[in-house]
């Protein structure tokens, strides 16, 4: 919402942990059961705490499910996490620690296993991307537009995938807006449409001129 341009993005992965307990009648023989939901409740804060051990990482609890009926000791439970990280190495280390903790277990008689539902790359600032930043700054100066403000974003984009192939990527050059993922309040700042289009056009001219050796249009 502040109109910043993006030079780096955190990666995003989705991890599910399944818990397997033993069902029993909650009234007659609760001692015969092993509650998967209770194990999940104990596991969530322990797993999320792992992010505090690796700078720049975050774990968000997104989905939970479990049980069959209120009077049955829950045999199954599941929690799905969203992971964020600044490098693929941090991602791999975080998942390794989560898996290790799951193998240790969270409650007697309940097993847990970790599954990777999606695995996304981070988008760190590269030397190739830095050259594009210089070009965008030059385009803004040529048009006498405000100097771009560059930031690191927590949200991932398709640019993350492109960057993983060694492509130079910068992001968020489109018109600005805010309140993402809010179906009733997400908005586009119309005042940013024309300046951003001019900036992109000028940047493409400068990029083409750099490739061909021709002078950019004025």
Named regions from a protein language model:
Residues 1-9, 13-218:
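Metal-dependent amide/peptide-bond hydrolase catalytic core
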């Amino acid at each position: 919402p502040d109109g910043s341009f993006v030079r780096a993005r955190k990666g995003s992965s989705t991890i599910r942990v399944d818990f397997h307990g033993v069902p029993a009648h909650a009234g007659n023989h609760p001692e015969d059961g092993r509650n998967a939901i209770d194990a999940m409740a104990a596991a969530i804060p322990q797993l999320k705490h792992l992010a505090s051990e690796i700078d720049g990482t975050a774990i968000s609890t997104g989905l939970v499910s479990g049980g069959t009926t209120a009077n049955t000791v829950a045999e199954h439970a599941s929690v799905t996490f969203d992971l964020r990280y600044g490098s693929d190495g941090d991602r791999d280390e975080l998942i390794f620690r989560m898996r290790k903790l799951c193998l240790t277990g969270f409650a007697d008689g309940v097993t847990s296993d970790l599954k990777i539902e999606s695995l996304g790359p981070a988008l760190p600032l590269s030397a190739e991307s830095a050259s594009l930043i210089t070009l965008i700054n030059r385009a803004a100066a040529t048009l006498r537009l405000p100097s771009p403000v560059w930031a690191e974003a927590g949200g991932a984009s398709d640019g993350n995938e492109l960057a993983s192939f060694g492509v130079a990527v910068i992001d968020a050059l489109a018109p600005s807006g805010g309140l993402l993922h809010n179906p009733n309040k997400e908005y586009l700042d119309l005042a940013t449409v024309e300046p951003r289009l001019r900036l992109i056009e000028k940047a493409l001219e400068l990029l083409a001129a750099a490739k061909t050796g021709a002078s950019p249009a004025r």
